[in-house]
Amino acid sequence: MKELFNHCDGEDLQVHWVTRPSRSSRSGRADIGPCIWYHEGMVSYPTAVAGAAWIAFVTASACSSQGTSPSSGTPTSDGANVSTDGGNIAAPPTNPQEGPLAGYPDGHATIPVAGRAEDVSSPTTVIGTGTPVSCTGNAFVNAVAKGGIITFNCGPDPVTIVLTSTAKVFNDKGTKLIIDGGNKVTLSGGGTIRILYMATCDKAQVYPPGSGDCNTNPGVELVVQNITFTDGSAKGIAEGTNNDGGGGAIHAQGGRLKVVNARFFNNVCDDLGSDVGGGAIRKLDYLVAAGAGPARPVWVVNSTFGGKPGFGNSCANGGALSSIGASWNILNSVLSENTAVGHGANSGQGGNGGAIYNDGNEIVLNVTSSLIESNIANEGGSAIFFVSNNQTGSIAIKDSITRNNPRGTFETPGLPGFYVIAKAPADIINSQILR
């Protein structure tokens, strides 16, 4: 795309995305405010608006007469900004402002204290100095490595921060890491980068303090709240490595995880694999000892995974959520338009759990006051795939709706969209389980 700038003074360039005009009206000249811009070249705005063509042009209340496009702080079509760590302007694949809000509007479950948002009134790190340009991926990566409480000051409008490297949690920087986006911040992997990584057994991230097996050490509690994750990718990350596969937005092995008032759009991981999963989130955990009770639960509260066509997450298994050995409490949330894209089931190619893939032994899945709809699994459990291998685990669906989750190659009779192996049949309480 070329832009020729004339008839302007000053600075503060801004790039706006606008709908393409008709061919007959494309004169190449735009009179905008005090400036006259000449522009040419088309771009295709990616997945957020399927098939729509857009033009980018530069505007300003004051601008240089022979300026160049800024590398960060790029407004999107509705005033949101894109912040990068340099390079040419590039709209991230997903425009989060086109996505649905966080949470299920009809969800009214009371949230226990353990599942509520954390206090961030005394942050350890504030990313940004009041402008989108000051909120960079590098600043975020460095803040996560430091630990503590992270907030953002990126200006009054929504901002998307595009990462060029994964933010990794260090296990020796305190027992809790809180990331609060203030309902304005989107973290984007740009379609190539996993966004967040935590692993208690990765030596490179320092083993957590204390004695005992790193797998069972409580480690760090990672809390993400009031924030959006888009276009994270864990494709090409092999299973069985320290940077274990799955979890396009968040990969958490060990430790604890809480997600409150968050959105996850178009996050992905590998298309094939027997256990690899979690387009949005993958959680790996282990029991302290056999019979000791379920593993530390993941809290997912008032959050949205997908939520409308074109925004769903995908992976071989667990299009949105995937876990081995972990339990979940999911409240007032929406999981829709997610896909388990693998195929072959037990042959090792996946395809299980369109929305949720939950595997382990003494595990518990509680879904309360939530909506799970329009998810797809090529094999089993288009809504939920729940397998307690020793049949000690349990699943409960309360005050919720599951619908339009089509049958793959197998499912549990009488439970459309489910495949369940547990100590007892799924506990369905005041819920609608619909085809």
Segments predicted by a language model, with ranges:
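Ser/Thr-rich, Pro/Gly/Ala-heavy low-complexity intrinsically disordered linkers and tails
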Residues: 31, 35-40, 60-91
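Bacterial N-terminal signal peptides that target proteins for export
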Residues: 39-52
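Bacterial N-terminal signal peptides
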Residues: 50-61
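Acidic Gly/Asp/Thr-rich repetitive segments characteristic of extracellular carbohydrate-active
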Residues: 127-151
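Extracellular beta-strand-rich solenoid/capping regions of secreted or surface-exposed proteins
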Residues: 141, 145-146, 162-178, 186-225, ...
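The right-handed parallel beta-helix/beta-solenoid scaffold, focusing on the short coil/turn
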Residues: 148, 159, 167, 175-177, ...
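Right-handed parallel beta-helix
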Residues: 181-184, 219-233, 256-270, 287-311, ...
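Short glycine/acidic-rich loop motifs that flank beta-strands on beta-rich extracellular proteins
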Residues: 189-193, 233-240, 268-276, 309-318, ...
